[in-house]
Amino acid sequence: DNVYYCGYHSKKSFGAASYFIQRPDGNVLVDSPRFTPPLVKRLEAMGGVRYLYLTHRDDVADHEKFHKRFGCDRILHTQDITANTQSVEIQPTGTEPLELAADLRIIPQPGHSAGHTVLLYRGKYLFTGDHLAWSARLNQLYAFRNFCWDSWPRQIESMKALAHYTDSYRFEWVLPGHGRRFQSAPEAMGQQMHQCIQWMDSVR
């Protein structure tokens, strides 16, 4: 489905992973990698960048450089806008999902930060930023309790809402900024989401 891991992590984004979605209606760069010539040339060869989607305020890195190079529209929830991102072109508000396109849905998931969102692509790939990842130690999906900057109870409520998307959209991939990626059948993903919520409740 033309989903790629970018590499070229940036210290400005605390080493977070970023991803690239190649699609006929415009490519999407998910969170900002380091702006470096080999990557930029590769992105150009693959059709450039239409949207630079930023999951939250921590992982914006070289967003301005990518915007200037590709003329892409940047996307960041208004609750996570800072002095460094005031010029972002698209600033979703509120807590309702936003249909960016027929195959792209932005889902607000406050908790890690006040304006954290996740991106669902084709109902199959969920780009989760710092909201949700696979833990090899726990052998399950989890959230980052020690790196929750807004509200842990709020993040739990967000995760419960996200679990409903597992039932509705049956996504199969969790692609985080930190932590391990995870893939499973939709039924197992639903079980994992509920197990994650139980764990989050246990470490309040």
Segments (PLM) and residue ranges:
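Metallo-beta-lactamase
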Residues: 27-29, 35-36, 72, 82, ...
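Hydrophobic residues at beta-strand termini and immediately following loops
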Residues: 6, 30, 92-93, 109
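Active-site HxH/HxHxD metal-binding segment of metal-dependent hydrolases
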Residues: 15, 34-102, 188, 192-199
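Residue-level detector of beta-strand structural context in well-folded domains
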Residues: 17-19, 96, 117
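Flexible, charged surface loops at secondary-structure boundaries
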Residues: 13, 21-24, 44-48, 120, ...
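Short, hydrophobic/aromatic-rich segments at coil-to-beta transitions
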Residues: 2-6, 101-107
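Zn-dependent metallo-beta-lactamase
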Residues: 1-25, 204
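Short, conserved beta-strand segments within well-ordered enzyme catalytic domains
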Residues: 20, 29, 53
